[in-house]
A protein has these predicted regions:
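N-terminal pre-core extensions flanking Radical SAM catalytic domains
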Residues: 1-4, 23-24, 168-171
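Radical SAM/AdoMet-radical enzyme domain recognition
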Residues: 7-31, 40-143, 147-156
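Short acidic, S/G/P-rich loop/turn micro-motifs used as interaction or catalytic elements
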Residues: 35-37
Length: 171
């Protein structure tokens, strides 16, 4: 072992979160600050473990939806049920999403949305606005409605403001 913890496995989760502890939880959010939750090996099994021990808790997850097969997404929807949702962080359409969500293929994103919603999943689409995708907001909103996405959220980004400098003034 190199001493680096890359991800928590289902066995790790079971040793940390005992059923008695899980029963008193109201919610759990997998947000992906250190990587997308869907690339962790045991994400679905971990969520199933939490659901098994607390059918009423709210379970949610943020993802770019760029991985896993249809069966996985359908199973995730079944696991979350009505007491959970997936927040799909998708920043554009086929020709722009990959500009910020690098290496994410649109066809996989679209397939993931469909399989999850067909499985009964509750979906929210978070759309970060950049210069390269702002012209697509209304088209994406319409697509979200057509697909059965419950909520479409537009988020302004200040990540790449042109002309912004952080130079220090000399005294």
């Amino acid at each position: 072992c190199n001493g680096v913890l890359d991800e928590l496995t289902l066995d790790d989760i079971k040793s940390i979160f005992k059923p008695k502890f899980i029963k008193q939880l109201k919610a759990m959010q997998l947000c992906g600050n250190h990587g997308d939750p869907i690339v962790a090996r045991d994400t679905l099994e971990v969520l199933q473990y939490f659901r098994e021990h607390n059918p009423d808790m709210w379970l949610s997850m943020n993802t770019n939806a760029g991985a896993k097969d249809d069966f996985w997404w359908y199973s995730l929807a079944q696991t979350l049920g009505q007491n959970g949702r997936v927040i799909f962080s998708v920043d554009g359409l086929e020709d722009t999403n990959h500009l910020y969500r690098q290496n994410v293929q649109w066809k996989i994103v679209e397939r993931s949305f469909h399989a999850f919603i067909e499985g009964g999943g509750r979906a929210r689409w978070d759309f970060l606005v950049f210069d390269f995708n702002e012209h697509q907001i209304e088209e994406a909103r319409a697509k979200a409605k057509q697909w059965g996405v419950e909520e479409f959220v537009v988020k302004k980004s200040s990540r790449f403001i042109t002309g912004h400098t952080s130079e220090k003034k000399e005294s």
